[in-house]
Amino acid sequence: MLGHAVNYGSHRTRRSFSRIKEVLKLPNLTDVQTQSYKWFLNEGIREMFDDIMPISDFSGKLSLEFVDYKLLKPKYTLEEARDHDANYSAPLHVTLKLTNHETGEIKTQDVFFGEFPLMTDSGTFVINGAERVIVSQLVRSPGVYYHSDFDKNGRQIFGATVIPNRGAWLEYETDAKDLAYVRIDRTRKLPLTVLIRALGFGSDSEIADMFGESDSIRFTLEKDIHKNPADSRVAEALKDIYERLRPGEPKTTDSSRSLLYARFFDPRRYDLAPVGRYKINKKLSLKNRLLRQTLAETLADPDTGEIIAKKGDVVTHELLDKLSPYLDRDDFKMVTYEPSKEGVLPDPVTVQEIKVYSKVDPERVVKLMSNGHIADDVKHLTPADVLASINYFFDLQDNIGTTDDIDHLGNRRIRRVGELLQNQFRIGLARMERVVRERMSIQDISTVTPQQLINIRPVVASVKEFFGSSQLSQFMDQNNPLGELTHKRRMSALGPGGLSRDRAGYEVRDVHYTHYGRLCPIETPEGPNIGLINSLATYAIVNKYGFIETPYRRVSWDTHKVTDKIDYLTADVEDNYIIAGANARLNEDGSFKDKIVLARHKEDNLEVTPDKIDYMDVIPKQVVSVTSACIPFLENDDSNRALMGANHQRQAVPLINPHAPIVGTGMEYRAAHDSGDALVAKAPGVVEYVDANEIRIRRDDDTLDKYVLEKFRRSNATKNYNQTPAVKQGERVVADEVIADGPAMENGELALGQNPIIAFLTWNMYNYEDAVMISERMVKDDVYTSIHIEDYESEARDTKLGPEEITREIPNVGEDALKDLDEEGIVRIGAEVQDGDILVGKVTPKGVTELSAEERLLHAIFGEKAREVRDTSLRVPHGGGGIVQNVQVFTREAGDELPPGVNKMVRVYIVQKRKIQVGDKMSGRHGNKGTIALVCPEEDMPYLPDGRPVDICLNPMGVPSRMNIGQVLELHLGIAAKQLGIHVATPVFDGASEDDMWNMVREAGIGKDGKTVLYDGRTGEPFHNRVSVGIMYYLKLTHMVDDKIHARSIGPYSLVTQQPLGGKAQFGGQRFGEMEVWALEAYGAAYTLQEILTYKSDDVVGRVKAYEAIVKGERIPKPGVPESFRVLVKELQSLGLDIKVLDMDHKEIELRDMDDDSNDHFNIDTLSKLAEQQEKKKLAEEAAKKDDKPDEPVDESDSSTSSDDKVSK
């Protein structure tokens, strides 16, 4: 028998074809969310308060300090928050201490800091009743970056940027003449020496001594001349910088000094964050710069004087290891520079320096200067950082040091939910700090308390804004468990502080070699976001600095054998090693079988001997994301189709009776388990009781655990969220085992679709262009039937004319329309409703004009009843019919929180059972998508020799050009596994080979070619050629024809243009665009075109008259002026252009006169006739004044009434 048996949970065994043993368990797949939030609650909040506090007033008499914080019990449980459209959050209380330094009095008080949203166990937040996910952001890490380029003359120019987490950027650059410049905060450039002088090193000799005598320094010093002899060089430099940053303002040495200090050296204004300090120390440290350099001085032990390295030695890895402990010391090669007292900071600057030879001119000595040993908690820049970064910049011109690749994952980091939240909270606290300072100055010092100083509104507002409207706070994709899991593991380069879609180029979107084992190279959206939104690889974790690490097996340096010791490496650390692939063949003892092994180093693929290898991949699937790891035979698919296959799985609709794939990858169990949709046992025990609603498990220590199952809840994607028990009474369970399946699960495994019998066969052109033909059995047996739940809300509000009322007494509605409503006017649960049926009867008071005497009398006798009301009932929208599943009524009396002005709210859930039908979209796992073109009767389907009809026919033309051969291999392996009655697992890059597949086919006793004779169901004749028939996992996707089909007869119009609205959501019409107009013009269908552009569109008066004429059975009158013509005229008039409509004789026609003619004789085409009439009318009026008898018949149309008035009448 091929393969080996592997258990997934206690209910499913698969035959696995993997050859590589699993040395590392998959980490929890939602850890990227939950661990980060845990950090925020435990450390992040405290860190933030410590940054902002203590807050002192301007005189220093009062100070407010942070003591502690605590989160209390949530107001609502998770379920209540969902039902009440509320937040799942807990009150945050902070203990603050107010000290009066004059009297020594201390007041400590507990202050409420607002409700703080809590994360659910599965890594989501419930905000306003809906589950949301905070997507992690991929951003450029703070630090110092160097780059080089070539100008148009082919000269190499260099640049450097110091990027903080918060604060001003510092940029260095050279030009074609080798002059070095600096830009501070994106302003105009200055000679770089100006910045050095401003730090307190004013003379040319000091600068030359510090940075050496390179051409670049010499030229820059020559350009940077002393312009104002009244000022010292340091003062002049400070003023030059001030002028660049604040042009036009009066400059003094003091103001210039404080401005430069505030920009870079003030911890409150400038923040590198721990990661920025780590990156800068790493980049500038001599440990990382000495390798392969030739020493220009002899290095000795400072204590013993023993020589460690001689002048002229080249620093190898071994020598560097020997030097490392000395480089970490505070007394080895340290140099202290004394700045002038006029400089920004008067303190001495200590750096570590070692002399080496230039790579460009081997005779010249160059200094390597590091920033000394700056502590990790110094979050602002120091003068030592600036000097060392300038030294690195000049060293690059001597070919010492390396430039940085911005797309390298060592230079991009992840901001996870905890950090994003902390940043947002910090903004709120900073706003609050300003308010506290102001209140400290105003309030009476003796009586003030912390509570009176604090205003929590800015803090609450910033948190609310982040969860409600940030680009990274997204409505969770709840189509199926896989979509949910992927959403939590998503990495977005967009969002505040990230990239924007339009500005992102190809480089940042492209797959980088550092993505290996960190970000999936396959799963990314198609369209404008391609490459900007990625998915975390299966085994990747995020370290404390936010860099992605991936695990590798360590190879022993002595024995060159692969050990089971696992190291997690970041991308920049990995660059130092040579790494073998996971499929390198090993002996039992862990040594490499082959003399030459395929390995990677940076972006190169090498063939090396085993003694050169440092690490080995853990497992092949560490390269891809969870979704891609669910595609069997991924290695046989073209990458573009694999991308579609990964995305389609997330769009699969949970079915009524799902089945896990016969051909899986072994990833299905973990994906379902970690998604948060399955119910998992907390502890081992025995199942004591099971029904559809709850499971009770008796633990080994005799305590009883009760698990309540979710039943028929509406998910975010309007799908049915339902849990079903996966265990039986008396069954033994272990901790962390799946005991109840969520949606799209079977036996604890992900089950997104079904395993139908599929034939690659064209059938009467019904498979043309990727169309799919399915058997009627799929409909009859509910194979692809899914349940969808939609909710509709109706609110009874207070209006100006009185309150709305939810009632059964609706005007002008027959009794048959009310048959399913209860006495309150709310539909009963279980009622079957069609489009347009009333769900909630509601009446709204009409505007009442002055009442007549009779009405007043009736009013006095019968009270409110005689008031006129209009029907504003909630009705089933088009395509929304189904069965009423649940009704929720919220009222103030019952203690429910309702928005202001709302007295009662009713929510009705309608459930639909959707069978598969023509127009629905289906897909496999290999990007082989198509829509259903025909549901064929079972008896007409092609059938196998044993009489079984196939379920689905796919077009064989869809395979060769698309190069997704994985589907063909899956097809053959699937039918073999089905015949043998087993499930198989073929993990990605380590699964069944083609030979394995054919051996399995042979074992199952299927023909040598894997094909079969197929018979035509209508004639009984065999098809000419043998056909590939097998079992392939096939999904029904969320793009269903029921959601897309749309038709309009009459409906709403746009207010301004009076044209029908567009789109299904607005119940709009289809736009008759210019191309459609050309088509009718080409046919000469003038009248058809005229009515489309007038009555059926935006001729307001014309459509009312046409309606009247149809009702009365009269001739339809001629159309009037389309409203959009008026809009055009008004638009042009609003621009100050005097637009008039003229007739043939250049006489003006008034627009409103073109609208109406009581006898309907006038025609819009004969504008000149109208002008004649107007002329005659004037003459007639003049004649009437002279003598009482008119000469001409006067047209008595009401030209004074505008069309709007008529419509309202």
Swiss-Prot record:
GO-annotated cellular components: DNA-directed RNA polymerase complex
Which N-terminal stretch is annotated as signal sequence? Answer: none
Task: Give the function comment from the record.
Answer: DNA-dependent RNA polymerase catalyzes the transcription of DNA into RNA using the four ribonucleoside triphosphates as substrates.
EC number(s) in its UniProt entry?
A: 2.7.7.6
Any one Gene Ontology molecular-function term assigned to this protein's record: DNA-directed RNA polymerase activity
- Annotated protein name in UniProt: DNA-directed RNA polymerase subunit beta
Assembly and binders:
The RNAP catalytic core consists of 2 alpha, 1 beta, 1 beta' and 1 omega subunit. When a sigma factor is associated with the core the holoenzyme is formed, which can initiate transcription.
Q: Which organism is it from?
A: Lactobacillus johnsonii (strain CNCM I-12250 / La1 / NCC 533)
Name the gene that codes for it.
rpoB
Q: Which NCBIfam families match?
A: PRK00405.1, rpoB
Q: Region Disordered: list its residue ranges.
A: 1173-1209
Would you identify the family this protein belongs to, as annotated?
Belongs to the RNA polymerase beta chain family.
Q: Quote the InterPro entries the UniProt record gives.
A: DNA-dir_RNA_pol_bsu_ext_1_sf (IPR042107), DNA-dir_RNA_pol_bsu_external_1 (IPR019462), DNA-dir_RNA_pol_su2 (IPR015712), DNA-dir_RNAP_su2_dom (IPR007120), DNA-dir_RNAP_su2_hyb_sf (IPR037033), RNA_pol_bsu_bac (IPR010243), RNA_pol_bsu_CS (IPR007121), RNA_pol_bsu_protrusion (IPR007644)
Question: What does the organism's lineage look like at the top?
Answer: Bacteria, Bacillati, Bacillota, Bacilli, Lactobacillales
- Compositional bias, Basic and acidic residues, is annotated for 1173-1192
An individual GO BP term: DNA-templated transcription
Q: Which UniProt keywords apply?
A: DNA-directed RNA polymerase, Nucleotidyltransferase, Transcription, Transferase
Please give the PANTHER family that the UniProt record associates with this protein: DNA-DIRECTED RNA POLYMERASE I SUBUNIT 2
Question: What is catalysed by this protein?
Answer: RNA(n) + a ribonucleoside 5'-triphosphate = RNA(n+1) + diphosphate
